[in-house]
Amino acid sequence: LLFGTVETWLIWKLTGGKVHVTDYSNASRTMLFNINTGEWDQDLLDLMEIDRKILPEICDSAQVYGYTDPDVFMGLQIPIASVMVDQQAALFGQACIEPGTVKTTYGTGCFMLMNTGEKPTRSENGLLTSVAWQLDKKRTYCMDGAIYISGAAVQWLRDGLKIISSASETEQRALSVENTNGVY
């Protein structure tokens, strides 16, 4: 029995079961990882009776983890060289490399992440502190604010309740009122 998140399973399958790894960003989202020490949290593992042996090795977000097994991947041996949580990857991909830089991604959900640099910053307003990435043994942290169903809620208004006929109609309705009376 082994444990891992989606990227751990994908790497395991693509390498033909040879590599069981994750990166720091994914490990930090398992609720089993201590973001201060950068290790699996033994107190939590003991509390939940989880054997450390089933957890993946935690690696930098960009390094060669292994190679695809030609027997399971189109006859090709290709290096697998980077994994990250999707929103942390978007933070990196949108060049939010310096502390204080922010990105927002809209889709099914809405996700705003801010690079907070090399030390975890605790939010007093309900944001999640997480590992953004680790490169060359240097860890970068972020704060994450998420509305998990923002886009899905618009779809529900259109398809479920039939209050609107198109997503763009939400803007027209929002602009049609004098003020929001504090509702956002």
Across the structure, where does each feature detected by a protein language model lie?
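Gly/charged, well-structured mid-domain segments that form the phosphate/adenylate-handling core
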Residues: 60-64
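Residue-level "edge-of-site" marker
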Residues: 57-58, 171
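Active-site core segments that coordinate phosphate-bearing ligands/cofactors
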Residues: 1-20, 31-42, 46-47, 68-184
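A short, surface-exposed helix-loop junction/capping segment
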Residues: 20-26
